């Protein structure tokens, strides 16, 4: 295949929701520049699972695994599409099956992001309070989780240098942007403008503590409305730390 096939694989907690929302909203502009990004659903908060279902199916335990027939169909349709020279697929689900993907598509390019493991741990805690009813105060783990770093290093050792596009994750407000990093790989950094809006906003400290306290009550029916309100209330709030220096 003389065309480019690119998989954005996340991993989790590295801005995938913002990337996928932007790509989904700009599908027509991308296609006009020769980049095919298949459509997918996006919820009211701009959150999506991306293109996972395009090439994956659930196994008996409900985990998404690569479906080689689906992948073949997608690649064949792309190869026969005269209007596109690049296929871009995005999903955090791809990170777990990255070895299967690179074996099935040896020339594939991979886009991924690395996040400070301390920030990753804090983000996981924030999410546990937001979405999973955690009522406990933050307690740092005894060891940092370096699993993502190790997986990416293993992938790097299996690919040619030009096949792996690995970037540092940028927090909102820091110089640079995960979306512009992706556009740079596509050669479209100057073609599309990127707003400073956030997707799946982290709670401010006050919102986080309020939600943690509320989690002791039966609030399942209010979760979506409450989450939308707390995200809106947290927009523009300053950064905070749950760890002492």
Task: Annotate each language-model stretch with its function.
Residues 1-245:
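Anion-recognition interface
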């Amino acid at each position: 295949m003389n065309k480019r096939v690119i998989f954005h694989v996340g991993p989790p907690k590295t801005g995938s929701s913002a990337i996928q929302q932007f790509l989904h909203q700009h599908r027509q502009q991308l296609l006009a520049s020769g980049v095919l990004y298949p459509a997918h659903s996006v919820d009211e908060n701009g959150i999506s699972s991306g293109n996972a279902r395009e090439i994956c199916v659930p196994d008996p335990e409900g985990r998404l695994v690569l479906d080689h027939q689906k992948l073949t169909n997608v690649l064949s349709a792309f190869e026969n599409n005269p209007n596109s020279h690049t296929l871009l697929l995005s999903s955090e689900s791809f990170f777990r099956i990255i070895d299967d993907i690179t074996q099935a598509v040896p020339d594939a390019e991979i886009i991924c992001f690395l996040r400070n493991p301390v920030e990753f741990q804090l983000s996981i805690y924030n999410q546990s309070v937001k979405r999973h009813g955690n009522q406990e105060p933050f307690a740092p783990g005894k060891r940092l989780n370096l699993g993502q770093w190790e997986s990416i290093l293993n992938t790097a050792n299996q690919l040619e240098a030009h096949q792996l596009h690995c970037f540092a994750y940028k927090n909102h407000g820091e110089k640079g942007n995960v979306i512009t990093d992706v556009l740079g790989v596509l050669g479209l950094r100057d073609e599309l403008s990127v707003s400073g809006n956030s997707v799946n906003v982290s709670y401010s400290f006050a919102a986080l503590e309020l939600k943690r306290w509320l989690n002791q009550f039966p609030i399942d029916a209010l979760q979506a409305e409450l989450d939308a309100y707390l995200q809106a209330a947290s927009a523009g709030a300053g950064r905070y730390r749950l760890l002492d220096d």
